[in-house]
């Protein structure tokens, strides 16, 4: 009712918005694309008004500080990162720590592992391409080849999420009533 929205392209590592611009900041599956997760975390919170709500949903890897990747997990993770040109995945624990280290969070960051709830989507995304082939053929031979090329990676993601190597993390934080301090190196 009277609400308006705009879609804009911006640099998530250096958002063009002034400090404290938004009541809510929502980020979905953007984190893996970010080369510096600490800068990304800070930018998400910087543009949030004091008392505002941050919600993030992202692909994450298991916290390898607690349990290092084994002999088969290392090549799987490398393939997933290479296929989708991601610099790295954070762990749920690691990204939560980065949010808290900004000192812009009131209290603790709440996290949840939604891997079980999102696991069926990997196979379903392949199935949707079969039952609705318009998307596969709409962009001609090149689009079809790119879509088919994704199938092994989607199956690999299903394996990674099913085995616990990858996790779908949800994050909720409230912006503290603090002035934004300069980023420390």
Locations of regions flagged by a protein language model:
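Short, catalytically relevant binding-site loops at active-site mouths
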Residues: 14, 60-63, 86-88
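A short glycine-rich, Lys/Arg-flanked "PGG" loop and its adjoining helix->strand segment in the class I
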Residues: 38-53
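Short, charged low-complexity linker/loop segments at the C-terminal edge of domains
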Residues: 176-184
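A short acidic, Gly/Pro-enriched loop at the edge of an enzyme's catalytic core
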Residues: 13-25
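Conserved SAM-binding strand-loop segment of SAM-dependent methyltransferases
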Residues: 2-14
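Substrate-binding/catalytic lobe of Class I Rossmann-like enzymes that use SAM or dcSAM, i.e.
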Residues: 68-168, 174-177
């Amino acid at each position: 009712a009277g609400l308006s929205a705009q879609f804009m392209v911006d640099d998530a590592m250096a958002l063009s918005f002034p400090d404290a611009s938004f009541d809510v900041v929502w980020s979905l599956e953007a984190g893996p694309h970010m080369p510096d997760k600490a800068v990304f975390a800070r930018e998400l919170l910087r543009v949030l008004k004091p008392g505002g709500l941050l919600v993030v949903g992202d692909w994450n890897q298991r916290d390898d500080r607690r349990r290092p990747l084994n002999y088969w997990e290392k090549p799987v993770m490398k393939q997933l990162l290479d296929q989708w040109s991601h610099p790295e995945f954070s762990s749920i624990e690691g990204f939560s720590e980065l949010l808290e280290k900004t000192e812009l969070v009131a209290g603790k960051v709440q996290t949840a592992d939604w891997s079980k709830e999102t696991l069926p989507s990997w196979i379903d995304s392949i199935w949707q391409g079969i039952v609705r082939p318009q998307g596969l053929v709409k962009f001609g031979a090149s689009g079809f080849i790119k879509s088919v090329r994704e199938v092994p990676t989607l199956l690999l993601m299903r394996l990674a999420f099913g085995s616990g190597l990858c996790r779908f993390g949800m994050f909720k934080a409230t912006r503290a009533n603090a002035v934004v301090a300069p980023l420390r190196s």
